Amino acid sequence: MPGVTVKDVNQQEFVRALAAFLKKSGKLKVPEWVDTVKLAKHKELAPYDENWFYTRAASTARHLYLRGGAGVGSMTKIYGGRQRNGVRPSHFSRGSKSVARRVLQALEGLKMVEKDQDGGRKLTPQGQRDLDRIAGQVAAANKKH
């Protein structure tokens, strides 16, 4: 559909569609340790989904589409959560820096993301075009239903 952007479609459906596109293309460089790692220090277990790296890459690309100039630190804040401390009160805990860094590096390898001169990363015009194209496909699929 012409004129459809990432902001116009359901974010969950868009992230699923983009993750499927990244997996199907086979160009995203996935580290070999993805099946043994936790995504944050406040998590107790590793993720159940074996394709979590593609989902995280799609979610990160969407975040960079909506607000560019985000770096590793801001990605750890976005993917942070509640650290449970047993009988003591819970506090906020950031996500994994290593996972955020590797996801951004993998997206850079696809030429979807580039380093911003003001700090952080931003979407390239090619990356923005890919995301808008997938958003159009998601909108067209929703219109059929």
Swiss-Prot record:
Gene from which this protein is expressed: Rps19
InterPro entries: Ribosomal_eS19 (IPR001266), Ribosomal_eS19_CS (IPR018277), WH-like_DNA-bd_sf (IPR036388), WH_DNA-bd_sf (IPR036390)
Main localisation: cytoplasm
Species for this entry: Rattus norvegicus
Function, in words: Component of the small ribosomal subunit. The ribosome is a large ribonucleoprotein complex responsible for the synthesis of proteins in the cell. Required for pre-rRNA processing and maturation of 40S ribosomal subunits. Part of the small subunit (SSU) processome, first precursor of the small eukaryotic ribosomal subunit.
Family from the record: Belongs to the eukaryotic ribosomal protein eS19 family.
Example of a GO MF term: structural constituent of ribosome
GO cellular component: cytoplasm; cytosol; cytosolic ribosome; cytosolic small ribosomal subunit; nucleolus; postsynaptic density; ribosome; small ribosomal subunit
Protein name: Small ribosomal subunit protein eS19
Residue numbers carrying Omega-N-methylarginine: 67
